[in-house]
Structures are given as structure tokens and as C-alpha cells.
Amino acid sequence: MTTIPMTAPLPRSRPRATAAIAGILMAAGLTALAGPARADGKLNAKYVLTVGGVELGRGSITVEAGDQAYEISGSARVTGVLRAVSSGKGVAAARGAISGGKLVPKVYALNAEADGKAETARLAMASGALKEMEVEPPLKPAADRVPIEQSVLQNILDPMSGAFVYVPGTGDMLSAAACARSIPVFDGRQRYDLALTYQRTETVKVAGYAGSAVVCSVRYQPVAGHRPSRYTVKYMTENKDISVWLVPVAGTRLMAPFRVSVATMIGTALLEATSLESEVKASTVPVNAPR
């Protein structure tokens, strides 16, 4: 196998830009990526990130999706006690098609900054495969880093698209079907799978949403770009205490994260929605359409 040619240095492990502001809470806002999707449903969500019960960050995400296209954007910032020792903010966005019963991303962009250090990523995809990439800053080469081969960059999702679950068909979205999947993520530096398994269904209530949530257990499975000898990689690979709670986005077949819980070495990291404002958007009918 050969390493895929890139427009930037070979992807490597994520730097400390506050973990690009803690994953996808730390995301979004680049909406000028090619024109709006034809939206049948829209979600405006706000989240808070805590570790061991201590607030570290807040963020917001907007999703618009129709039958054939979707776009996701969001932003986040460091808050709480962490602001006394660190600063950080980030924006990210993704857009793509809905085809073959799944999300097929086309573009992804991330801009993050922490303590004066910037991190950027730009991915362009076609038919689920990576075509172009720019990532800054590059990391120093490491002999034990698993190389990223072209074969593992097929049928991938960017981190924003991978944070949402698409349930095809017309059946009940609030069922075990929401968890019956493995999510293949590539963030420009690492390729990994998130294997979901159904656990249970809970009742939740937050501003804008009151109803059921499907709870999935999650296993982190590194594929490429990681360093197997690193303790954090070993810890996360063996971590059996990761879960995501999913709720439906009105007017779509998308499921959004209500809560993400990850056991860490310093306490449980909890990303939880403080509001989930979801609405169905009626299609516009031309004035000359048949009546």
C-alpha cells in the first residue's frame, strides 16, 4: 500500500490546541462553504463541557438538513476555571450529501486557537474518499506512528459529520437501530472508528426538547495516524466507559448528541446539551406551481 499524496504534510496526532477545544463541542461557524442546503429540518443546540463536575467550555451547533443535503456549523470557547490558566476558541463546519442511506461529506473546515497557537484543517472529499487536505501545524515525525494509507481513507466521515447519526428508512429512529453502526472518522491527523452498541432508552428534558433518548455505548478503535505506545491511546482503546445519548432532529432522519460521557484519567468528561431547539422547515412552493 502507498501513502496517499497530500497537499500538506502527512497527518499526525492532534496537537494541544485544547484538543481542538475538546473535540466537537469545540467546533463550527464556517457557513460559506458553497451555498445553503435545502433544509427540511433545523437544529440550534447549545452545550456545556465539564470534567469532574467542573465547567471547562461552552459551545453551540447549528444543523440544517433536507432529503439530499446537510450542513453543520458550530463554535466553542474555553470557560470556567480553565480561563484562569488557558484561553481557547474554535469554529468548524461541514457540509455534504445524503445518499445511499448515509451522510456523504464533501468539505470540512476547522479553525482553533489556544494560548496564541493556531490549528487549522481543511478536508475535501468525494464519494466518501479523501481527495485534498491541508493541516497546520504539522507535527514532528515519530517512528512509532501508524502511517495513514489510502486504503483507510475510503467511506470516511469528518468529525462534525461523525457527531450526528443518520438513521435511514421510515422506521422508528428512537430504537436500537440508531446504535447499530461503526463510525469511520478522519480528522486530518488521525483515522479511527467509533463502534456504537445499543444500551437502553432514557427520558430526557432540556430547553426545546422533552422526550426519549437512545443511549449507545462507544468504543474507540484507532486505525492510523496514532502512536500505539502512547499511554493515552492505550487508555482510550481500553476505555469501556464511553457513551452517547442521541435525540432526533425534527423533520430529518438525523440523530443529534444530547450527552457524551467519557471516563478520563482526571474524572468524567461530560458534554451535555443545555438547549436543543429543533424545527421542521416547510419547503417553498413556487408561485407558478400547479395547485
What does each model-identified segment do?
Residues A112-M160:
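Internal, conserved structured core segments that host functional sites
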Residues M1-R16:
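N-terminal secretory signal peptides that target proteins for export/translocation
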Residues A39-S127, M173-R291:
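Acidic, serine/threonine-rich low-complexity disordered tracts
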Residues S151-G188:
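Extracytoplasmic beta-rich ectodomain segments of secreted or membrane-anchored proteins
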Residues R16-M26:
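Sec-dependent N-terminal signal peptides
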Residues L25-A28, A263:
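Local alpha-helix boundary/kink/capping signal
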